[in-house]
Amino acid sequence: MPLIIVVAGIALLLLLTIKIKLNTFVSLIIVSIAVAIASGMDLSKVVTSVESGLGGTLGHIGLIFGFGVMLGRLLADAGGAQRIALTMLNYFGKNKLDWAVVCSAFIVGIALFFEVGLILLVPILFAIAREAKISPMFMCVPMLSGLLVAHGFLPPHPGPTVIAREYGADVGLVLIYGIIVGIPTFILCGPVLNKFCQRIIPDAFKKEGNIASLGATRRFSESEMPGFGISFLTAMLPVILMAVVTIIQMTHAKSAADSGLFYNVILFLGNSTIAMLISLLFAIYTMGLGRGKTIPDLMDSCGKAIAGIAGLLLIIGGGGAFKQVLIDSGVGQYISTLVSGMDINPILMAWGVAAFLRICLGSATVAAISTAGLVIPLLAVHPNTNLALITLATGAGSCICSHVNDASFWMIKDFFGLTTKETLLSWTLMSTLLSISGLIFILLASLVL
């Protein structure tokens, strides 16, 4: 019965969002309440469960997400992201544009959320394509693979950040393992897959794209952009801070001496929220004050960045409410009991649930957060599971098979002037391979970590 309730809840969510076209956040709250009631939860506890799920999720991610999106906006508005992309392209040269693009997208993607990175990088690709006299499609798949790996695997992106907290995983470890697993994944799904796509959809690689669909975009001159070194450091500072502290924790056993002021300061600086705040303040100087911009101008950019994610924050909160209802209603525990005797690898379980929800719901973030509600009870049966790898497996599963119920599918189709079939055989194929290959690399990592 609980399984039927979950499936019915997902079906209701699809009906509300796709057929009736109700707002996704409102739909998630309605479905959360419906699933709670159908599961037999005491009516007096339904609203409390929804509120605690929403508040608990946003309470953690709100600061990280807010600081992160402001940092990304400052980097983009100063031309830092464009500098990173162009430097990588110049370094690799015309013959290895796909390698340059995938590396640039991954670096930029750490600081910028998927849709923002896409809108920022596409005009740069079109300009390079014109100069190189090639179709921008030659760089499409590599760019998307770099952005998607960062989006699905790495904090401070919303999915990995929220599920790391829900599972109790160390965010720094998720970052380190995510980079280790992510690099071979985006290489396979970027430059390597790109060659295959050229053979199966050759006509797509003759198209000039649809740059007009992006509207007005700004392209910085050479003198307007900051240097590569400072741009790279600004984008990567959150990663550096969290990774360094995590490595210190891993290599130094905590003793009585470690509990002193120095050790506590290190832990404080490595906290994901503090690391993002420090990085934001650093960006305000390197991408703003140090380049002659005023505080009002910088705060205007930050304000616009926050305004742009208000809807997304609510959707993430709605996903958190759904997750909490699955836990509080006992549905997650029921599924855990059901599969506990099957000896299923929890990494495979997390990936499979996230993949199923992603295909049904379209949103990678909502799929990842909802997965936690079903997987958390299972972790009690497998207490020695590497929680960072469970987080990555959930993220990898949430990346699979982006198709017609995902807004990104239509954005990519429109930007590059593709047919639906061509989009399925490029973007959808890439996201599916990325999810599966990511899972394989995570399973390999679990053998040694």
Swiss-Prot record:
Which is an annotated Pfam family here? Answer: GntP_permease
Q: What is its main location?
A: membrane
Where would you find this protein in the cell? Cell inner membrane
Q: Where is the signal peptide?
A: none
Q: How does it sit in the membrane?
A: Multi-pass membrane protein
Family of the protein in this entry = Belongs to the GntP permease family.
Recorded GO cellular component terms are: plasma membrane
Q: Provide the species name.
A: Escherichia coli (strain K12)
Keyword line: Cell inner membrane, Cell membrane, Membrane, Transmembrane, Transmembrane helix, Transport
Indicate what this protein is called per its UniProt record: Uncharacterized permease YjhF
Q: Name one GO biological process term.
A: gluconate transmembrane transport
* NCBIfam families hit by this protein: gntP (TIGR00791)
Q: Which InterPro entries match?
A: Glcn_transporter (IPR003474)
- Any one GO MF annotation of this record: gluconate transmembrane transporter activity
Q: Which PANTHER family match?
A: GNT FAMILY GLUCONATE TRANSPORTER (PTHR30354), HIGH-AFFINITY GLUCONATE TRANSPORTER (PTHR30354:SF22)
Any keyword Ribonucleoprotein? no
Q: Where are the transmembrane segments?
A: 2-22, 24-44, 52-72, 106-126, 134-154, 173-193, 228-248, 265-285, 302-322, 337-357, 361-381, 429-449
